Amino acid sequence: MLLQFRTGTNSDIPQLQELAIKSWGEYEKVLLPDYWIKLFSNISNPDTYSELLEIAHCEVCTNEENTIVGMAFLVPSGNATEIYEASWCQLRFVSVDPSYNGQGIAKTLTQKCISLAKQQNEQIMALHTSEMMDKARHIYESLGFTILKEIPPRFNKKYWLYTLTI
């Protein structure tokens, strides 16, 4: 199976939406219906991706048919939110098509974002993840991310803020 990595663009938005729905669909089983509806409306909204693409680098993984099977966004420092400091870059929306799980795609996407952050002289990379994202937490911890603190629950689930000194 030939997998390739490239920069994602606005023309990829329909595939990014489709991938997110596939990837995040597993959480429908563990979220209360109201929370799933809220999450689904975010991941299925094209504006979610167009707004990220305005400020962030998008790294995608494609299969031999050029279908996007993985994505991650690197938001540069200077984009503070209620949980991210302005001096941090952010790793966002790491997602993999479930039929491609276990092939190292999420880890490679994360490593590519770390490498790009180093090239851009970022100092700290941050991300948030939850108790329902065991596989993701394992990948992040294996790459050196550590829990900075627990943040207020989202979707009635525990969430943590992780950081990595670059």
Regions found by a protein language model. Name each.
Residues M1-P14, E18, K22, I166:
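Conserved N-terminal entry element of GNAT/NAT acetyltransferase domains
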Residues K22-S23, E59, S87-C89, Q123-A126, ...:
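C-terminal "cap" of GNAT-fold acetyltransferases
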Residues V60, T67-P76, Q90, S95:
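Conserved beta-strand in the GNAT
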Residues N45-V60, Q90:
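A short helix-loop-beta-strand connector motif used in the catalytic cores of GNAT acetyltransferases and
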Residues R92, D97, N101, S130:
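Residue-level recognition of the GNAT/N-acetyltransferase active site
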Residues V96, G102-S115, H138-S142:
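Conserved acetyl-CoA-binding loop-helix of GNAT-fold acetyltransferases
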Residues G78-L91, N101, N156:
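A conserved beta-turn-beta hairpin within the catalytic core of GNAT-like acetyltransferases
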Residues Q4, I21-T48:
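Conserved GNAT-fold acetyl-CoA-binding loop/helix
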